[in-house]
């Protein structure tokens, strides 16, 4: 009986905070209801005023306007919205790279088309039968050049050698129509004639210049396509389970807490996004190498390899070669007859060499060097601007898409309440996320889709490096099928269920300007937790009091 007054007093003290808290008025959930409905969800079951938040699995468990279903729906929504942000950012880069590809491709194809058209327009009047009876040889040449540019596995030097051989055979036969020339005789003729350069220096000179020009042109065009394709595939990588939780907490938990107008802290947002885009940031090094390689090749295109002059004058070089053959016809024929013997005279009559063509006729080629210069300048500017895309992406998403608060703001959403955000900002890349306070990142398991794209960047950069020094490289079509990654499941249990290793309750006290929590909120929730604490205190105090009264 002596214990009763002490026990009664302690019970009164323990129950006092609870009675005081019950008198406070819960805040309205009107803002959250409006947002929830605007996102396309039904308002059935949505609280009118704050409720107890012990059921929450992602957001802090204080008073809340969100039910379990709302939290799950918001988690799904945050994931889809974040992935949409990534795709939108990626599309802007794809648009730039694709536009550069199309600009150069149109320019290059136009050069080739104009050269071919000039040949078709002028050669009939210049060479008569020498051209009209051998049109297919010229068409095949331009067809092979286009196929090479498009990435077909063609040896360009062999294709050019084949063209000159076929042209020599056809022209020699046509210029010596009075003779019966067999295929065996043509084989012998080619061996002897080539020793005496029937076309002059044109074949060798054109082979060197055209090969270099086509190598850099197709590598340059392909580089833009590969870059665009890499961005497209990386932008489609699904958000991980851990990131879905972190992004939900960043974007929608303040609404659940009744802080709809409070923006996320800038550094808090950066840590979330850097953790979620850790694998993407690892593209940075190879991405910069690709951009630099494209700039270097652009300088070659508008410089030493002079694509405009070489490609735009192919028809003129062919005309020059034919002129050389006509001028050297007598000596070349004599040397061939000497080495291969005199062919039999044909019953068809004398040579059908066209009388229209005597002497050299100068063909004109309209230069588009200014257009190429402007095209290259524009490309170099865009490539330089895109070099830092992957490292600046988190900042861009936070400032322009998520609309995070300025870094100096100390009244922003820090993941638990309104206040300052104290943790340092993590570096970019997978290895730097080992201590990320917002996202649990397994740095031992890199994303394989992104690793494959890093390899694609390396391969393309190597091709551009070879092209830059005039080396031909094997090519493959970069427009392979899109490969999706991940499923579209909505907030699985292992996403919404609290993680043991990095839940809100494991935050260090210095992380935010609030005390450490174990699933409880800050406003109102702390007072509701006091009875439990006092009852624990009561148990211990009772033992002490009983001991003192003995």
UniProtKB/Swiss-Prot annotation:
What GO cellular-component annotations does this UniProt entry give? cell surface; endosome; extracellular region; plasma membrane; side of membrane; synapse
What InterPro entries does the annotation carry?
Glypican (IPR001863), Glypican_CS (IPR019803)
Tell whether Heme is among the UniProt keywords: no
Q: Where is the composition biased (Low complexity)?
A: 481-494
Query: What residues make up the propeptide removed on maturation?
Result: 525-550
Q: Which GO terms describe its molecular function?
A: fibroblast growth factor binding
- Map out region (Disordered) in residue numbers: 475-494, 502-522
- Lipidation sites, kind GPI-anchor amidated glycine, are 524
> Where are the glycosylation sites?
76, 113, 382, 483, 485, 487
- Which modifications occur after translation, per UniProt? O-glycosylated with heparan sulfate.
Keywords for this entry? Cell membrane, Disulfide bond, Endosome, Glycoprotein, GPI-anchor, Heparan sulfate, Lipoprotein, Membrane, Proteoglycan, Secreted, Signal
Query: Where does the protein end up?
Result: Cell membrane; Endosome
- Secretion signal, residue range per the UniProt entry: 1-20
- How does the record classify its membrane topology? Lipid-anchor; GPI-anchor
Recorded coiled-coil stretches: none
Give the primary localization class.
membrane
Q: List the disulfide bonds.
A: 29-65, 59-253, 66-256, 188-340, 243-276, 265-412, 269-398
Q: Could you tell me the Gene Ontology terms of the biological process aspect for this record?
A: cell migration; negative regulation of fibroblast growth factor receptor signaling pathway; negative regulation of satellite cell differentiation; negative regulation of skeletal muscle satellite cell proliferation; positive regulation of skeletal muscle satellite cell differentiation; positive regulation of skeletal muscle satellite cell proliferation; regulation of protein localization to membrane
Q: What does the similarity note say?
A: Belongs to the glypican family.
**Protein's job:** Cell surface proteoglycan that bears heparan sulfate. Modulates Wnt-signaling pathway.
Mind telling me what this protein is named?
Answer: Glypican-1
Question: Which species is this record about?
Answer: Gallus gallus
